[in-house]
A protein has these predicted regions:
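Catalytic Cys-His active-site segments of thiol-dependent hydrolases/isopeptidases
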Residues: 91-98
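Short, surface-exposed coil-to-beta transition loops
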Residues: 73-80
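Short beta-strand segments that buttress and anchor functional surface loops
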Residues: 65-71, 94
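N-terminal signal peptide c-region/cleavage motif recognized by signal peptidases
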Residues: 4-7
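N-terminal secretory signal peptides
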Residues: 9-65, 138
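A short, structured loop/turn motif at beta-sheet edges
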Residues: 56-59, 83-89
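Acidic/His-rich structured neighborhood in mature extracellular/periplasmic domains
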Residues: 66, 88-90, 110-111
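C-terminal partner/receptor-binding element of secreted or periplasmic proteins
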Residues: 11-29, 99-138
């Protein structure tokens, strides 16, 4: 690997699923998913297709927010997660949408939600806002 290639690799943003595997984040993630029923393996492990997380300020607090989706099925199975600034807590919502034409055309009307990490109403509002900002969410 050349020096320029190494520099480029070092500056590549970490995806949400990669972040979940890092020390500090992984322990918090395991606490969130522990005891959750009907949680698919990709969601339980925090592995899947994802983008780099972003810092979001909500109600005066900073959170690292990202999304992860089931590989090869992102439109129907995805989740948004929010880590506290100190990495001591994570909340999430897993969204499942039936694989039918009407559900894919109007996902908000057919979505099933699974809340993770016992989010309060304010955290649910923040995670819901993330879902609603998804392209084609109607």
């Amino acid at each position: 690997m050349s020096l320029s290639t190494a520099s480029l690799a070092a500056s590549k943003p970490v995806s949400t699923s990669e972040l979940v595997q890092q020390s500090g984040y992984q322990q918090t993630w395991q606490k969130m998913v522990k005891g959750q029923k009907n949680l698919p393996v990709w969601a339980r492990k925090g592995s899947g297709t994802s983008t780099p997380p972003e810092w979001v300020t909500w109600q005066g607090k900073k959170y690292q927010v990202g999304n992860i989706c089931k590989p090869h099925d992102c439109a129907n199975n995805f989740m948004y997660v929010a880590f506290s600034n100190d990495k001591k807590q994570v909340w999430g919502v897993r969204v499942e949408i039936a694989d039918t034409p009407d559900a894919l055309d109007h996902p908000s009307k057919h979505a099933k939600y699974q809340w993770l990490g016992k989010p309060d109403s304010q955290m649910k509002a923040m995670l819901t806002k993330q879902i609603e900002s998804t392209p084609d969410w109607n």
